[in-house]
From Swiss-Prot:
Organism: Mus musculus molossinus
Keyword set includes S-adenosyl-L-methionine: yes
GO annotation, biological process: lipid metabolic process; melatonin biosynthetic process; methylation
PANTHER family: O-METHYLTRANSFERASE CICE, PUTATIVE (AFU_ORTHOLOGUE AFUA_4G14580)-RELATED
Lineage: Eukaryota, Metazoa, Chordata, Craniata, Vertebrata
Active site, renumbered: H266
Keyword line: Lipid metabolism, Melatonin biosynthesis, Methyltransferase, S-adenosyl-L-methionine, Transferase
Entry function: Catalyzes the transfer of a methyl group onto N-acetylserotonin, producing melatonin (N-acetyl-5-methoxytryptamine).
Pathway: Aromatic compound metabolism; melatonin biosynthesis; melatonin from serotonin: step 1/2
EC number(s) given by UniProt: 2.1.1.4
Catalytic activity reported: N-acetylserotonin + S-adenosyl-L-methionine = melatonin + S-adenosyl-L-homocysteine + H(+)
Gene this protein is translated from: Asmt
Binding site for S-adenosyl-L-methionine: Y153, W170, E216, G246, D247, F248, R263
Entry protein name: Acetylserotonin O-methyltransferase
Disordered, as annotated region: 355-387
Note: Pineal melatonin synthesis is severely compromised in most inbred strains. In many inbred strains, genetic defects in ASMT have been identified. Melatonin production may have an impact on gonadal development, testis development being significantly promoted in melatonin-deficient C57BL/6J x Mus musculus molossinus animals.
Amino acid sequence: MHRGRSASARQERDFRALMDLAHGFMASQVLFAGCALRVFDAAALGPVDAAALARSSGLSPRGTRLLLDACAGLGLLRRRRGAGPRGPAYTNSPLASTFLVAGSPLSQRSLLLYLAGTTYLCWGHLADGVREGRSQYARAVGVDADDPFTAIYRSEAERLLFMRGLQETWSLCGGRVLAAFDLSPFRVICDLGGGSGALARMAARLYPGSEVTVFETPDVVAAARAHFPPPADEDGAEPRVRFLSGDFFRSPLPPADLYVLARVLHDWADAACVELLRRVRGALRPGGAVLLVESVLSPGGAGPTRTLLLSLTMLLQARGRERTEAEYRALTARAGFSRLRLRRPRGPYHAMMAARGGGAGARSDGGGGEATSQTGSGTGREVGAQD
């Protein structure tokens, strides 16, 4: 009897765990819908009830009440028992106030909307991706493109959403990865595929003696100029960041003392990573280095789970995968770099630095580029923007 009861209790626990996994997509959609319908923006102004929110937002009263209750059940809202026909009132939880309200300094709303409109749709075709070993943009969003960024940038609105999502990511963890190593000895820093310039501006603030350049595609730089004005520092000064337009696989790369590749290599297969690293090494001055920012797998590749899931995102949306420290060391060594070091600051992303080295392995592809002196930026060559 004791064994039977133990087995039954274990089965019940396992079944609950199974159902939590099976229904996990529902929780994601509650979060995404709450952001898309600006539920958390409304609750930031004061307690809301379902009927009033439905009227002001053009929503169905029944659907609104069900969504608000689900948000409360997930800990996104707090539900206050109400008296009378208005029913309960809802307020934001601390999590929602910090990360889900559009005006919050640490808001992740754009990132979540990008995940909902692109990444989530690709994940609906995971079995196809595993069978075929390729991205699933054609099935998910109707864009069959060899370059994954053609699908991500399928409209100007999607481009801007992606750029904002990356900017939000760096608002949380950019400073930590930039401070993982002392970058002050590097006078000229180039952020390759530097997005809206958020990480580059952080580098300019942390290391005011350095000149920081963002190398980005022309269309992204144009979008940054129009939509991402640089924030002023406390003293009113704007962090100075220069921009160069080009394609980092084809265009000459500017000379620099340090290249930053933040969440870039995981987009690409090994051969493309080595090619890009060789180009970077050829543009580095003597004594230079490369700083890689990635979510690094544990030795043997058994975890963490979040990084394993992100690796599947690379299957569905790009050509690469997440890697272990040893795999990044092998890639950098093939490109001619030496002495890769790994730092694990608090947060989901890790910092690795490798020295330029003096041996063979580099093709000298550095040089000019189309320079534009601008205190704005473009969007990076990074696909799975999850935090």
